[in-house]
Amino acid sequence: MTHACSFTLSKALNFGALFVRRSKFHLNCLPKCSCTPFRMESSSSLRIGNIDSRGALVVLEGLDRCGKTSQCSRLLSYLEGLGHSVELWRFPDRTTSVGQMISAYLSNQSHLDDHTIHLLFSANRWEKRSMMEAKLKAGTTLIVDRYSYSGVAFSSAKGIDIEWCKAPEIGLLAPDSVLYLDIPPEKAAERGGYGGERYEHLEFQRKVAQCYQMLRDSSWKIIDACQSIEDVEKQLKEIVLDQVTACKKGKPFSLLWSCDSRDCLKYGRLAEFVKFLL
């Protein structure tokens, strides 16, 4: 493990231990930090600069083995064929130092406290945030295989408070489209390669599915992933092309879960500490 990697892990472990000890977490419990205080907004739609045209942020979510990775690749080829600038991203990004720690955890090569690994997953998204915004502003559409919703669903499935799980994600860019590939956990378990990593167990996936239900809102597009690959692909293409067109016309960026609810305010500064990990 590199020095930078071990330093990040040490900080994450310290923060994770603090959060575990304080089951009722309040702002006055937090250690001092030089980060700029994060302002909570009552609306999640915040314009970032004057953008005439930009790329779309499209996120595919769902249980393990629901078909996300295959559909992401198909969407990439489709948009490239239409002449759009487009890239495929995946979270966790296992190429970074934080991502390598996550990869070791997922492959059962290491063990971390549940709160600690959640903060590392969030840090993995934060370390790509500035690049993500720059790519979108430059007109590149990003097809993203898993995002913050996965982090929240999987951690809350372990019994961690869902608002606590959402708090480190506050301030990340919100997707223009969330495409949820819906499949019963039992059906997903029948697909090849299931069970290779830490979370790929039927009972846990059932809990994850329940947590996804809590996260869904009217903006999500729910796709029946039990259909043929071709039928799923056809539906996704139509939705994504509409979003790409809207973003080229200057659709404003939004931020994730910006709110003024009591729980958001109570846990809101977690995002500052996640950024401090990097």
Question: What does each model-identified segment do?
Answer:
Residues 2-52, 76, 186-278:
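NTP-dependent small-molecule kinase module
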Residues 61, 181, 225:
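Catalytic metal- and UDP-sugar-binding loop of GT-A-like glycosyltransferases, i.e.
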Residues 75-78, 105:
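Hydrophobic residues on the short alpha-helix immediately C-terminal to a glycine-rich phosphate/catalytic loop
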Residues 146-211:
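A glycine- and Lys/Arg-enriched "phosphate-lid" helix/loop adjacent to the NTP-binding pocket
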Residues 82-173, 235, 242:
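ATP-dependent small-molecule kinase phosphotransfer cores
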